[in-house]
């Protein structure tokens, strides 16, 4: 297999972190499992996630159930209704704050690094990650994802409906400035 470290720089136009994530989403056949502390999506990334699920790929998002920052937490929840409607499974980690940034797909490829699934990481920050293709450690990355998933609660349409008014309003009001977050 291959293990390829890479860096992403906001000073060029390459957007390597986003391209790697989009490539994994677009080529997935069986599953894409994603663990990220922040979920503030642009239209292109949200469309890629939804398209993967709609073509039969199991897309699972694992996010914090306990936030470190209220506004990004509320913003993430604004995406839940449309993601759930497309068949994406969303889980929230209940024991604490999950800070891992992991993509793993089809027992074939994975990314582990510093790149969150949000505007700041994808467009504004210096980030780094490691892309793994057919590397021997990919099953262990998936095992870790599954072990973490076992400590999560699943988000449903009912969960979204019962979310507090404060969280809903915070998320939708802040959506206008989401690209800055």
Feature locations, PLM:
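Charged, low-complexity intrinsically disordered terminal segments
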Residues: 1-181
């Amino acid at each position: 297999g291959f293990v390829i470290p890479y860096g992403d720089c906001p000073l060029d136009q390459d957007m390597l972190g986003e391209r790697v994530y989009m490539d994994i989403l677009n080529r997935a056949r069986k599953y894409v499992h994603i663990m990220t502390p922040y979920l503030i999506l642009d239209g292109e990334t949200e469309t890629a996630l939804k398209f993967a699920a709609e073509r039969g790929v199991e897309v699972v998002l694992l996010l914090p159930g306990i936030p470190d920052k209220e506004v990004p937490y509320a913003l993430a929840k604004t995406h839940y209704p449309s993601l759930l409607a497309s068949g994406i499974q969303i889980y929230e980690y209940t024991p604490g704050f999950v800070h891992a940034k992991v993509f793993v797909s089809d027992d074939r490829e994975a990314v582990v690094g510093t790149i969150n699934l949000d505007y700041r990481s994808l467009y504004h920050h210096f980030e780094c990650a490691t892309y793994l293709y057919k590397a021997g450690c990919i099953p262990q990355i998936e095992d870790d994802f599954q072990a973490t998933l076992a400590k999560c609660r699943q988000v449903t349409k009912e969960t979204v409906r019962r979310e507090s008014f404060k969280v809903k309003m915070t998320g939708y009001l802040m959506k206008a400035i989401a690209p800055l977050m």
